[in-house]
């Protein structure tokens, strides 16, 4: 690996370095993380919860008060039930209501068997091992491999982008408020930028979760597609500061995303199907 590996999110051996740390949580968000830990513990006892993680801009140290959201991953000992989902939604709502520093809370639920399965090894397993910061319980990263920026990782992380298109189109058609359009814009834009990055990740030989950097890495490998490059840069901008403009949603969902999904399948193939 070249001397720039550290600047590309890699360890010295070329594996992807885990991003984020509780020590990097900005002071303004420390009470939010502490409350999340306490409320998760209160909502899920030791017979249900195996471990909990925080991910995104807060543990990376780049969160902006009033703009950034709180992202959590809760790993249960068995597959989540309806009661577990309800408990997670209550934790989300309580944290969002009590802390103005955050603009929304999202808690993903899964199980230990799912995270450590062969099927999820290069998707959810990678996500936990490299993009999530331990908050509670045993860190499952110890049961997972070290990951490299390979075509296999690219395929399994975002090789199903095409499946998101019908859902985004339906949400765009049904959106009745600016808040709904902004929520869709942020989610779709982030997924598009991350897919644009992982499309070229094996060539770049590194990892980043920074949206602006991801768009520029994509641009490096698609100089003959200036329109797509500018659309990807737009996606990076609205991924951080979402727009309610229907024209922006149309550009992302009806133009850039279908092209990117087709390009992804051509380069890396289809993600292994899930049951």
Where are the regions a protein language model picked out?
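Conserved NTP/Mg2+-binding pocket subregion across the NTase superfamily
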Residues: 2-28, 32, 83-183
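Conserved nucleotidyltransferase catalytic core and NTase-mimicking acidic/glycine-rich helix/loop elements
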Residues: 2-9, 140-275
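A short, contiguous, amphipathic alpha-helix enriched in charged residues
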Residues: 31-40
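Short secondary-structure junctions
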Residues: 40-51, 99-103, 225
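Catalytic metal-binding acidic patch
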Residues: 54-88, 106-109
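Short, solvent-exposed polar/charged micro-motifs at secondary-structure junctions
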Residues: 61-64, 115-120, 240
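Short, well-structured alpha-helical interface segments that form or flank functional binding sites
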Residues: 67, 123, 187, 191
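Hydrophobic/aromatic-lined pockets within catalytic cores
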Residues: 80, 96, 100, 197, ...
């Amino acid at each position: 690996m070249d001397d720039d590996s550290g600047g590309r999110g890699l360890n010295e051996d070329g594996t992807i370095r885990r991003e984020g740390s509780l020590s990097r949580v900005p002071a303004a968000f420390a009470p939010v993380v502490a409350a999340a830990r306490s409320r998760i513990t209160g909502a899920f006892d030791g017979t249900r919860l195996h471990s909990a993680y925080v991910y995104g801009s807060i543990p990376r140290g780049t969160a902006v008060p009033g703009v950034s959201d709180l992202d959590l991953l809760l790993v249960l000992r068995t597959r989540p039930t309806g009661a577990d989902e309800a408990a997670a939604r209550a934790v989300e709502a309580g944290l969002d209501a009590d802390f103005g520093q955050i603009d929304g809370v999202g808690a993903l639920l899964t199980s230990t068997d799912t995270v450590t399965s062969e099927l999820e090894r290069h998707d959810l397993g990678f996500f936990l091992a490299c993009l999530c910061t331990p908050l509670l319980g045993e860190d499952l990263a110890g049961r997972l491999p070290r990951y490299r920026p390979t075509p296999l990782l690219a395929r399994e992380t975002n090789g199903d982008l095409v499946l998101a298109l019908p859902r985004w189109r339906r949400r765009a058609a049904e959106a009745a408020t600016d808040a709904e359009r902004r929520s869709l814009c942020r989610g779709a834009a982030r997924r598009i930028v991350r897919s644009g990055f992982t499309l070229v990740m094996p060539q770049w030989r590194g990892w980043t979760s920074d949206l602006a950097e991801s768009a520029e890495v994509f641009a490096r490998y698609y100089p003959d597609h200036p329109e797509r490059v500018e659309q990807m840069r737009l996606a990076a901008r609205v991924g951080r500061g979402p727009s309610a403009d229907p024209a922006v949603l149309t550009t992302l969902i009806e133009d850039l995303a279908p092209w990117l999904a087709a390009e992804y399948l051509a380069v890396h193939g289809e993600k292994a199907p899930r049951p």
